[in-house]
């Protein structure tokens, strides 16, 4: 120790302890429950019950108000059939022009299913995350234009000059065929599952509304000019409760801050944001519409621009692959499937491109390695995408075969006049028969389900090819999977072919089945009379032909058959009257005369047959070659 330095004893500590106070419990910034959601749930449940009651009433009484479904408006625009769906859709658009897009939020059964699915997922701790795309949001509008505008535009350019743009309106408010425009029940159930549940799981709440609902395409446009909006007062403190509770995936807090109102056309006026606002700063009111307001809020999207174009391609390919495949998948279901396919394809792409990827609370990939959840997701995605590709393969061959079938020009009446119509087939017909057979057989052999419209086409192609037994078998198989008019026609064609083969008892059974399905099918009555005549039951045959004439006294063949029957039974005056009636409506067409002659010759009415053969040759001497 240096001289002069003395040790000093520190008597006090240099740091002073401060008293520690207990913190008060932190205030929980909880979002209060929405009172509006309960009212909306009640409205949607009531709507669902009314829909069920509507179906029950139709099943019990046989007649009811036509479906209150916007797609029914297509038949009004195309055929002039004014129905309940057209009236509802018109009123809904008009209401949206004033109040905004509230019909979707409070009056749509598909949205009710989506909300129910989201509620279930949250019960399992899974909160649907919105899939945001720049391009796919235009799908609903494009489809709406295709459904409701394109037919009128096409008619404008294609219609004859003397026809009106829109056909004369007729009253179709009441119908006995309530389900005629809907898919079968076994398709409707998976349709509701795909569009009401799966779209929510993969695309977020209201995923179907955002990317697949064509009616929403028009409602979104109407919402832009509607004065009714969710608006804000100065009491807003940007807590974000509104955005957190919005089930339409709208950035409510950001939009009301920037624009003073919600401008996103996806807002369905559910009123949840208004109900949960802690300061009661939000309200529904009228004022300036959203149109013309510059959109300055930058959104975060799920895809890059390169991925956007890839997603658009995948969506289109998937939609075309599944729409109407097996003659079962309706357009709206195809749109729902395509959105899910697009999500799975893009997420699978990312699974191989990025180091880390999650889906809900599951880690699909971490630090470059695919986890167990990732392999499960990948397996599901590959199965789903594989089924899409398979559907596309089947749909291509169905479509190609159908086009070839439609290009076969030989008239049915001529082909059915004899068992072997080969002599009447043109080179073009032969080519289309071969093309149709190739594509339709490929579709049938690859199909996972039965296409009840392909089988009758194959039956007709086989008949024209001379394979009558195969044609009969295909028509029998088709009838097992058909309903209504389609089933009746399969029974009719089967009966007609069996008549030509001389198997009259079987033909009679098939024709009776056709008439049981559709009692006004007069062609089946004509063929039924032929079966009875050939079986020796002549009075019953005359009765069948009389039934046909009573429904339409202009039937040339039926009147000729009655004339021939009257001659056979010794009733010359009646024969002359029937023949005169037939001649009155017989066109000066050689082919028509020839077909009538062949049909009369089939039942042994040779004198009348020769009369028509002679008239055909007189009109066109080339038919003389057919006698040789």
Residue ranges and their predicted role:
Residues 2-257, 275, 280-422, 432:
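Non-ligating segments of multi-cofactor redox enzymes
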Residues 389-480, 506:
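Membrane-interface segments at or immediately adjacent to transmembrane helices
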Residues 394, 451-453, 485-489, 522-523, ...:
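Helix-start (N-cap) detector for alpha-helical repeat units in TPR-like alpha-solenoids
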Residues 433, 440-441, 475, 511, ...:
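Hydrophobic/aromatic packing residues within the alpha-helices of TPR/SEL1-like helical repeat arrays
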Residues 446-447, 481-483, 517, 551, ...:
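Structural marker of alpha-solenoid helical repeat scaffolds
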Residues 464, 500, 534-535, 568-569, ...:
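Register position in tetratricopeptide repeats
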């Amino acid at each position: 120790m240096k001289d002069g330095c003395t040790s000093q004893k520190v008597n006090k500590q240099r740091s002073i302890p401060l008293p520690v106070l207990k913190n008060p419990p932190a205030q929980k910034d909880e979002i209060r429950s929405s009172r509006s959601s309960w009212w909306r749930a009640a409205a949607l449940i009531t709507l669902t019950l009314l829909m069920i009651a509507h179906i029950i009433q139709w099943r019990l009484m046989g007649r009811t108000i036509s479906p209150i479904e916007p797609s029914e408006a297509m038949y009004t625009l195309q055929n002039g059939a004014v129905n309940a769906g057209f009236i509802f859709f018109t009123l809904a658009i008009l209401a949206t022009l004033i109040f905004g897009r509230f019909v979707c939020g409070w009056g749509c059964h598909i949205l009710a299913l989506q909300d129910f699915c989201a509620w279930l997922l949250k019960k399992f701790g899974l909160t649907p995350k919105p899939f945001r795309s720049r391009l796919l949001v235009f799908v609903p509008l494009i489809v709406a234009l295709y459904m409701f505008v394109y037919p009128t535009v096409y008619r404008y350019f294609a219609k004859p000059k003397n026809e009106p743009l829109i056909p004369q309106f007729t009253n179709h408010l009441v119908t006995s065929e309530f389900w005629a425009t809907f898919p079968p029940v076994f398709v409707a159930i998976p349709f509701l599952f795909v569009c009401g549940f799966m779209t929510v799981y993969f695309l977020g709440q209201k995923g179907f509304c955002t990317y697949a609902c064509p009616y929403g395409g028009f409602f979104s446009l109407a919402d832009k000019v509607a004065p009714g909006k969710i608006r804000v007062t100065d009491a807003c403190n940007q807590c974000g409760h509104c955005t957190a509770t919005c089930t339409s995936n709208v950035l409510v807090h950001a939009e009301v801050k920037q624009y003073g109102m919600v401008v996103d056309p996806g807002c369905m006026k559910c009123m949840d944001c208004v109900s949960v606002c802690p300061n009661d700063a939000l309200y529904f009111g009228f004022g300036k519409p959203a149109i013309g307001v510059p959109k300055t809020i930058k959104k975060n999207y799920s895809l890059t621009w390169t991925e956007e174009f890839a997603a658009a391609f995948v969506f289109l390919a998937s939609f075309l692959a599944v729409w109407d495949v097996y003659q079962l998948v309706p357009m709206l279901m195809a749109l729902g499937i395509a959105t899910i396919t697009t999500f799975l394809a893009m997420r699978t792409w990312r699974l191989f491109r990025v180091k880390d990827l999650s889906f809900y609370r599951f880690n699909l990939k971490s630090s470059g390695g695919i986890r167990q959840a990732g392999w499960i997701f990948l397996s599901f995605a590959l199965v789903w995408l594989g089924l899409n590709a398979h559907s596309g393969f089947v749909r291509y061959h169905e479509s190609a075969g159908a086009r070839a079938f439609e290009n076969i020009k030989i008239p049915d009446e001529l082909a059915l006049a004899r068992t072997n119509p080969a002599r009447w087939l043109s080179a073009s017909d032969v080519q289309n028969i071969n093309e149709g057979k190739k594509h339709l057989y490929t579709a049938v052999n690859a199909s996972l389900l039965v296409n009840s419209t392909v089988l009758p086409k194959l039956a007709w192609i086989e008949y024209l090819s001379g394979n009558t037994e195969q044609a009969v078998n295909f028509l029998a198989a088709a009838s097992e999977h058909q309903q209504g008019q389609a089933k009746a026609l399969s029974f009719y064609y089967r009966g007609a072919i069996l008549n030509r083969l001389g198997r009259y008892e079987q033909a009679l059974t098939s024709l009776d089945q056709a008439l049981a399905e559709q009692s006004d099918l007069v062609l089946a009555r004509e063929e039924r009379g032929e079966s009875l005549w050939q079986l020796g039951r002549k009075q019953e045959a005359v009765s069948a032909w009389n039934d046909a004439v009573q429904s339409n006294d202009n039937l040339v063949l039926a009147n000729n058959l009655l004339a021939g029957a009257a001659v056979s039974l010794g009733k010359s005056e009646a024969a002359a009257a029937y023949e005169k009636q037939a001649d009155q409506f017989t066109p000066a067409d050689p082919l028509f005369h020839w077909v009538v002659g062949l049909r009369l010759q089939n039942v042994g009415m040779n004198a009348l047959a020769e009369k028509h053969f002679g008239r055909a040759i007189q009109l066109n001497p080339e038919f003389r070659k057919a006698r040789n």
